Every structure is written in C-alpha cells, then in structure tokens.
Amino acid sequence: MEDRRESELKTFCSKNILVILGFSSIIAVIALLALGLTQNKPLPENVKFGIVLDAGSSHTSLYIYKWPAEKENDTGVVSQVEECKLKGPGISEFAKKLGEIDIYLEACMERARTVVPKSQHAETPVYLGATAGMRLLRMKNENLASKILSTVAESITRYPFDFQGARIITGQEEGAYGWITINYLLDKFIQKSGWFNLKPRKGDTQETYGALDLGGASTQITFVPQNQVLESPENTLHFRLYGKNYSVYTHSFLCYGKDQALLQKLTKDLKNTNGTIHEPCFHSGYQRRMNVSHLYEAPCTRRFLTSLPFPELEIQGTGDFQKCQQSIRPLFNTSYCPYSRCSFDGVFLPLPQGDFAAFSAFYYVMGFLNLTSEEGSFQSKVTSTLEAFCSRPWAELQMYFGDVKEKYLSEYCFSGTYILTLLLSGYHFTAETWKNIHFMGKVQSTSVGWTLGYMLNLTNMIPSEEPSSTRLSHSTYVFLMVLFSLILVIVVIIGLFVCHRPSYFWKDMV
C-alpha cells in the first residue's frame, strides 16, 4: 500500500515538475529564436549611394556616400566612401569662362562613375549646392550666377546619374545642414536605451553639439540654446527628428569668411596709405602686390569704397600678432544691439552653451598650427602659438613649409588670428568656454560639413519620429543569448534529474 502511494506521489510530482520545466524550456527556446531572428538578419546586399557637390567660394569638392537600403531610417548608417577635390577655384570664378566647366567637373565626375557600381548609376542622386561665393556673385550679377548654375547642370546631366539639380543654398540652410551632419555622425539624435542601460553613462548625455562653420566667404554658428528666449524669429529653425523637437538658433555672416574678411581688412586699411600697407598679419619679409580694382569689385568691400590715386597696392609684412588682432577687431561692429544680446552688426546671438564642433576652415587652419588636439582646448595656448608663429620671418617659413602653397602659407597668421578674434569678439566665447570648442575634420572617416546633412534632408533619411524598434547593442545581445542558453541547459538537467531520482527523494518530499 505504501509503495503504491509512493508511486502515485512520484508520478504526480514528476508530471507537475516536468510540465513546469517543459513550459520554461519552450519560453527559453522561443526567446533564443526571437533574438537570433531579429538580431542576425542577413545584411542587405542592396547598398544605395548619393553624391553631393559642395561648390564653395574657393573650391569645389565632391562627396560620395553609401548606406544599406534596408536601414535608411536608422541613425549613423550613412558613411562616406569618397572625397574628390576639383582642381581649380570655386564655380563663381568661371563667370567669364563657362566653356571650361566641363573640364573642371570631368575628373571627379568620372571618379564617381568608377566608385558607384554601374548597375546603380541611374538610381544614384546627385546634388550640387553652391554657397557664399555664388551668393555674392548673385548679389553682384544675378543673370551671370544663373548662367553658371545652368552650365554646371548641363554638364552634370551628361553623366549617367539621377541629377537632382544645382542651386544656391541659403546661409541659414548651410548652418542647419552642418548642425544636422555633426549630430548625426556623433549619434546625438537617438537616445541610447536598452534593458541594461536605461540610464546614460556619466558624461554620455544626449545634448546636441553646436556647429561652427568657416568658409572663404561666410561663417555660420548653429546650436540649440537651453532655457533661453529666441528673440529673433528669422534666426530660429524648428526640427522634429527621431521623435524629438529641436528649436535651433542659426545665423550666417556673409562676408565674414576668412578670405572676404582679409579683403575687408585690407580695403579698410587702404584709406590712410599712399599705396603701401605695412601689414602686421603677414610675416616680416613677405611682399605682395594687388590690383586695387580687385579689392573693390566684391560686394563685401563696397562699404569702404573710396577714390584712390594709385592702381596697385603693395603689402609689406611686419609679423606682429598683437597689432594684427587690434586691426581685425574693428571688423566686428558691436556698438549697436537691438536685442538683449548680440554677436556683431546688430545680430541676435543667445549665450553659446555646451559643446561645439568647429569644422571646415576652422579645422584646416588650426590643424596646420597643431591646435586641434587637447592643447588647443586652452585659449591661452592658441594665443601663444599664434604669437610665436606670426613673428617668424617669411624666409624661415618658406624653408620649413616648402610644400605648402604660398597663398595659404602667407595667410595662416591672419587666418589663425581672425579665427581667435571671431570666436572671442564675434561669438563671445571666453577663456573658460573655449574648452567646449572641438576642432573636427572627420568623424568616423566622414568629412564634417553641410553636405551630408543636405543629402539626408533631401532623401528624407532622417524620420520625424523615432523608429519603433532598433537592434540591441552587441553586449546586451550576447548577454541575453548566454542567459537564455543557460536557462535552457539548467531546465534540461533538472528534467533529467527528476526523471531518474531515487525513490527516497519522493519520501523526503512528503
């Protein structure tokens, strides 16, 4: 009788335990299958390409981007595969030689034809955006600017790509697209979250970076002010990206790119000379001759227009950083401000907050001066470096930097001093907030600038709402796979143990 009760108890317990174990094993198997299927989808073979030409004031560059077709709405999936710099000046310089535009574009367009697979030529969009150089030409001669763009368009349409047009983008667009680019590359638009990282790591906040862009003819500042009233609607843009709203301040200062700023300074200094300028922003021993008419033909220098008795200007460098900075400061008119805060020329500027990425000429000039590393995060180091560099004789520089073009080498003293003065006197950074400026050329092998943001916007690859599901991080995925595998193994071991446990085990359970 007792043996029968023991047998019935064993059978009852075994069935219940096995049911529980079976249910647990099914859940573990389903979890493993679900993780495997969602996380290890085969990589899409269909890669898409996009081409953007940046027609700047001093040169034109072509960028080729690629991305997996099935991940267009993910963040950080677009990568740069090629950068090709066209030989020659910016397209605005072709006003009197339109017939040379075909040759100008040929090398880089042929390079694009080689890089992009032939089977995808017809579906690869090509965009050309012209910036401040063409904005200035349009101010001077709108018909001529239109002719250049139409000639460029005719040339590009001869290639087997999906040409989407050539246009002059506004300064506001240039600033906004640069801001989108840097924050897309730094992965700042999507809040990182998962089962085991619900709280961001210390220092891993999701605040966006501000963008500082400097070209030859204009400069842009763009950022999201925190807890500040945006007093100037024309400088405010509203974006909804990945389910989050952004109120972005942006302004483009036409004529305040480094090349046009130099022309402004030289034209201003001409008033009190007899045709010779002793220029502290050029190195001692350096000489340059310029046609006076060239100085006054640009819209940026018209405010200094005056009648001069000499046709040619002679520049003689003196190499003095302090005097150079003193002569640059008057370019920024801070005497008038109709708002609570201004940058210069009466333009509203909120208090710069948070980290900023400084790219384009900001990066190239500071890179030449070896100020893009941690040392460059101290304003005092930047000042002392420029002071030492500007004082070096021209002959010495030519000997040490013989491979650098004379135009660029001769202007690094001015350009570096101008950048320092623009950031301090124009944008009102301080010695304390200078450390928040990060000079960047590339992020993850992709050039920082407005072109990527431009393409992302035109191809609608940044959704307004956050994707409903994203892949787990690699560490989370591995952890879950190991966890559910262990659960499955433990369930099997317990099941085997239950089925083969000696009879006294069941007696102990009574």
UniProtKB/Swiss-Prot annotation:
Cytoplasmic membrane side: 1-16, 499-510
Protein name in the entry: Ectonucleoside triphosphate diphosphohydrolase 1
Domain of life: Eukaryota
Keyword hit for Disulfide bond: yes
Disulfide bonds: 84-108, 255-300, 281-324, 337-342, 390-413
GO MF annotation terms: ADP phosphatase activity; apyrase activity; ATP binding; ATP hydrolysis activity; CDP phosphatase activity; CTPase activity; GDP phosphatase activity; GTPase activity
GO cellular component term of the entry, any: plasma membrane
Catalytic function, reaction form: a ribonucleoside 5'-triphosphate + 2 H2O = a ribonucleoside 5'-phosphate + 2 phosphate + 2 H(+); a ribonucleoside 5'-triphosphate + H2O = a ribonucleoside 5'-diphosphate + phosphate + H(+); a ribonucleoside 5'-diphosphate + H2O = a ribonucleoside 5'-phosphate + phosphate + H(+); ATP + 2 H2O = AMP + 2 phosphate + 2 H(+)
PTM field: N-glycosylated. Cleaved into two polypeptides that seem to stay together by non-covalent interactions.
Catalytic EC class: hydrolase
Glycosylation site residues: 73, 245, 274, 291, 333, 370, 457
Side Extracellular, residues: 38-477
Regulation: The ATP diphosphohydrolase activity is decreased by half by sodium azide.
Family per similarity comment: Belongs to the GDA1/CD39 NTPase family.
Subunit structure: Homodimer; disulfide-linked.
GO biological process terms on file: nucleoside diphosphate catabolic process; platelet aggregation
Keywords, ordered alphabetically: ATP-binding, Calcium, Disulfide bond, Glycoprotein, Hydrolase, Magnesium, Membrane, Nucleotide-binding, Transmembrane, Transmembrane helix
TM regions (residue ranges): 17-37, 478-498
Cofactor list: Ca(2+); Mg(2+)
Pfam families recorded: GDA1_CD39 (PF01150)
Catalytic activity, EC: 3.6.1.5
